[in-house]
Amino acid sequence: MASPDVEYRCFVGGLAWATDERSLETAFSQFGELVDSKIINDRETGRSRGFGFVTFKDEKSMKDAIEGMNGQDLDGRSITVNEAQSRGSGAGGGGRGGGGGYRGGGGYGGGGGGYGGGRREGGGYSGGGGGYSSRGGGGGGYGGGGRRDGGGYGGGEGGGYGGGGGGGW
């Protein structure tokens, strides 16, 4: 399955609750043509989970956006912008440090868990394979991860979005 599904997608974290897809699109469109902008909402409450994705038409625009927007203020909050790997690409455990973040293993919708879990002991947004921006972190994940004791926002060994340990969200 070597389809040319190359996506130039950025993960955008630390979003203000008030940030909507239109303001996300406005902030990032200065770097190039956007294919998509999406804010992830909680399934039950419909409220923003504080992160989203923007997809560019070309790689240069994506890299310029990461360089230009990471650490910048958007709607009163300092945001984090990283390259996101497509959910369908890469063989498990790949990426830097293996098994964490958006470069393989866990990540949003990847690994053994994905959005909403799916493992016997928990799951959460990134299952048992690492947090949203963890590079090599195991365990944790946004909503807990596949361990009863791990979890928290980034959980596990290698960090993650906001640190480790201490119960699920």
UniProtKB/Swiss-Prot annotation:
Tissue expression summary: Predominantly expressed in meristematic and growing tissue.
Subcellular location: Nucleus
Domain (RRM) ranges: 8-86
Highest taxon of the lineage: Eukaryota
Nucleus among keywords: yes
Keyword RNA-binding: yes
Keyword annotations of the record: Nucleus, RNA-binding
Listed name of the protein: Glycine-rich RNA-binding protein GRP2A
Alphabetized InterPro entries for the sequence: Nucleotide-bd_a/b_plait_sf, RBD_domain_sf, RRM2_NsCP33-like, RRM_dom, SLIRP/GR-RBP-like
Record's function text: May play a general role in circadian phenomena associated with meristematic tissue.
